[in-house]
Amino acid sequence: DGGYAEPRPCVILTHGYPGTARNDDLVHALRRVGCVVLTPHHRGAWGSQGNYLVSHCVEDALAVAEYVRTPEFCEKFHTDPDCVFLGGHSMGGNTTLNACRKLPWLRGLILMTPFDSTRLIRNGRPDQLRALLPAGYNLTGYDEEVFFRDIEARVGEYDFEKSFDAVKDQNLCCVEGALDTLAPLEEMFLPLWRMLEAHP
């Protein structure tokens, strides 16, 4: 709209499972300070075509991140292709940490109570993960067993600690809830955070 002389930063915010669709309060706060904000709906969520899987969420985030760097997008929305941030809430934090490994050009990451989808399986509590899956009943083409198997197949790949090399020198903002019982800091994010603290 010509209100900013310099190209604007672009922020991509990914939603949780099935989560809050757009995190509108945060979106508007970012918009008011001059950011262009995208809140994509992953495959199978809120009317989007396709099936909702953790691996699809990562693929979707990669596709959106590459799209916002195209000349067409940058010209239309007056954004800086070198000032793109990726963030997410809960399972969207999982999406962010796994997608960022293939997006070394990101300016920064925003994690809000990130949920490590493989953690409960790795910690010997797969039934606790399965107990969460009925919440996805409203997702298109959703099958609890297929969803679980998609996560299970990514143990050792999607573990948060595997993101260390991608985030060790990255701008990172992580917001956690001290009383969060679904994605507790100690279990979900603290193992990676300790690795980052030890990084010189």
Indicate where each model-derived feature is located.
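Short beta-strand element of the alpha/beta-hydrolase
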Residues: P7-G16
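Conserved alpha/beta-hydrolase
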Residues: R31-Q49
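Alpha/beta-hydrolase fold nucleophile elbow
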Residues: K76-S90
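Hydrolase active-site cap/lid region
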Residues: N98-F147
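Serine-hydrolase catalytic core
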Residues: F147-P200
